[in-house]
Amino acid sequence: LKYKSITYDPEPSTIGVKNGVSQLEFYDHFISEHKNSKKIEEYLIKSDIDFFLNNEQTAKEIDLTGLKGRLYPLANETDLIVFSPMMWGYNYIVSQNFIDSLNEVQVSDEDYTIYSVDIENAQNRNYYLLFIPIIPSNEVDYVNSILYKRLRSNASEKKYITISNFQEYNDLLDDYPFYDFTQLALPSTYKSKHILNIQNHVDLFLSDELIDSLQSKNVTNLVIKKHPKLVIQDHSL
């Protein structure tokens, strides 16, 4: 499979609001009213990434069905909705159109989990929180990845860097925290997955097949990015 990363469009012309980061809020009182409020707070909102990764299966199985949210005034309804507060593993609320594409390309049930949510002021009643397991940074194939230091300069001045392992990556970040990948590599264990969520990489990676399906349905608030390139090795590390 070949992949591209996706993001959302922060412009008011698409999401309706000017904050650029969120169309909807799961307000504190909505969370506190939910039957699993304590687990939501403990595992998804207030935890750090290490706690989450160590308890990811438990976090994934927290039933969020019926969690109430509210669109901000002027926010548009789109097929991908960005929301607050941040919850580990949940990048977007998605519409039935998005779910139909997951089914169309036969994305494995092991690769995602959905829970229907109640958006009080939405016209469309079929929205879902989409959980994608996070691939830990220590599973990235750093030998075949390429990084560059993020500078206030044009692309021609980028200095590309190759490293050998996860420890070298951590050492780089300790020295200078602003590195981006121009190529990101994963081991062969991930080669059949249509949707990937990698630690320290904000955007999801989708297979070209899944992207084609989403675009055929005119899914809104979906932005396809050219970089970084994702490669999955044919052999195990």
PLM region spans:
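A structured, charge-rich N-terminal accessory region that forms the first stable segment of a protein
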Residues: L1-L67
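Short, flexible beta-strand-to-coil junctions
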Residues: K2, T7-S13, W88, I135, ...
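Short, charge-rich amphipathic segments
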Residues: V21-K39, L74-A75, E139-R152
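Short N-terminal edge-element motif at the start of the domain
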Residues: S37-V105
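Short, compact, well-ordered microdomains
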Residues: L80, S84, W88-Y92, Q96-Y112, ...
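Acidic, proline/glycine-rich low-complexity IDRs
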Residues: Q123-L237
